[in-house]
């Protein structure tokens, strides 16, 4: 039944912050979404998620939760399981899809089984990566269960030896063949792939390029041949469905133009994409005619348990 605002879930708790390496990104997303939801007519409570989250939610008693958490605990199925246990409808993907997408190796297995184009990769420890080339260069080394390009190393084709890693790298690292070309991304909203964005940078699309002002330029819609645009949209939608995602997701791809459609590679699918007004997914929604408050409101009205 709709509340006084005409909304199914008039009182919303926005989860943000948390304890992962992506805390600052999450706070930015959370504050932006809170403001947008207030503009859309919701009563919003901001919640900096911590170990006392169950108690806080019991006190707040929201009709639904908007999950603006990023990284471990927030997008790996943990908080999703808590919300289902508490029977609070929530946004974005459920337990299984969130856990699969956060584990890059498991997600790749799902993608490959679905016939989606992925690149060669292996899982290795930091000691193994530093002892010798795990794959022929060029290749990329990154944590298997992190986002926002945290802890990413690129080993060039002419590298003299393996990379020297930071001492705090996690135990499980994904090492994958480096794919040259353009960085493309597609947001899926429900059962619709919105658009293709071409991410233009001076180098690797790392944490600074993603979040530093002027670090990258987003071209939406991407200037691509029609067949490549269609293929990107199709791959993102199939990836969303293969993982069992709900709400929105964003799939990142690389395109080696010299190989035509065969040069498209799916890198990963993010179940909790960045959510500031200038983030990639809201930009694509705006291209499709949805304001940021409308985009956030759609996610809240899509909320449910057992996702």
Curated annotation (Swiss-Prot):
Top EC class, one word: ligase
Cellular localization per UniProt: Cytoplasm
Ranges for domain ATP-grasp: 108-301
Catalysed reactions, as listed in the record: 2 D-alanine + ATP = D-alanyl-D-alanine + ADP + phosphate + H(+)
GO MF annotations, alphabetized: ATP binding; D-alanine-D-alanine ligase activity; metal ion binding
Recorded metabolic or biological pathway in which this protein acts: Cell wall biogenesis; peptidoglycan biosynthesis
Keyword Aminoacyl-tRNA synthetase: no
InterPro entries: ATP-grasp, ATP_grasp_subdomain_1, D-Ala_lig_Van_CS, D_ala_D_ala, Dala_Dala_lig_C, Dala_Dala_lig_N, PreATP-grasp_dom_sf
HAMAP family on file: Dala_Dala_lig
Annotated protein name in UniProt: D-alanine--D-alanine ligase
Organism: Cereibacter sphaeroides (strain ATCC 17025 / ATH 2.4.3)
Source species taxonomy: Bacteria, Pseudomonadati, Pseudomonadota, Alphaproteobacteria, Rhodobacterales
Gene transcribed to yield this protein: ddl
